[in-house]
Curated annotation (Swiss-Prot):
Organism encoding this protein: Streptococcus pyogenes serotype M28 (strain MGAS6180)
Role, per record: Cleaves peptides in various proteins in a process that requires ATP hydrolysis. Has a chymotrypsin-like activity. Plays a major role in the degradation of misfolded proteins.
Entry EC number(s): 3.4.21.92
Domain of life: Bacteria
The protein, known as: ATP-dependent Clp protease proteolytic subunit
Amino acid sequence: MIPVVIEQTSRGERSYDIYSRLLKDRIIMLTGPVEDNMANSVIAQLLFLDAQDNTKDIYLYVNTPGGSVSAGLAIVDTMNFIKADVQTIVMGMAASMGTVIASSGTKGKRFMLPNAEYMIHQPMGGTGGGTQQTDMAIAAEHLLKTRHRLEKILAQNAGKTIKQIHKDAERDYWMSAEETLTYGFIDEIMENNELK
């Protein structure tokens, strides 16, 4: 159930679902697994807010275990495409594809709440349902290309080498807010709506 907010206006009461009300303040919630429907909703909101006023920041709150690489990269590409700065604020966790999205916020405007976590790892994949050796080889090659593309983005976002990201992402690599700040994925830790 989505909460409803009631506001008093000069014309009387007006009710909004909570997400529409947050959108009025240029806040987008990216929560739950990254998948096509969620990505399309986030992209539409980014495009709407950028068209409305591209001189004001957009606030993207992130709490996701990750998910679809293609859906996540569509969000990242849109964040880079629009003119408005996108502040990212990680609450809860940014894991897997979530780290790619959260770390792609505007440099200097990537934040994290003190008890949130970051996790990087190599992408997971399957054979796409095919069981023939050639299908498996094609899927493996695609997975390696995808891994390199994600490592390149993460390296750029953190100011690390691709080699370092490759090594750290070999297995699940969890980081606290302080560790994420030191690593370079965020710019500041936010506490009580103030920077730490």
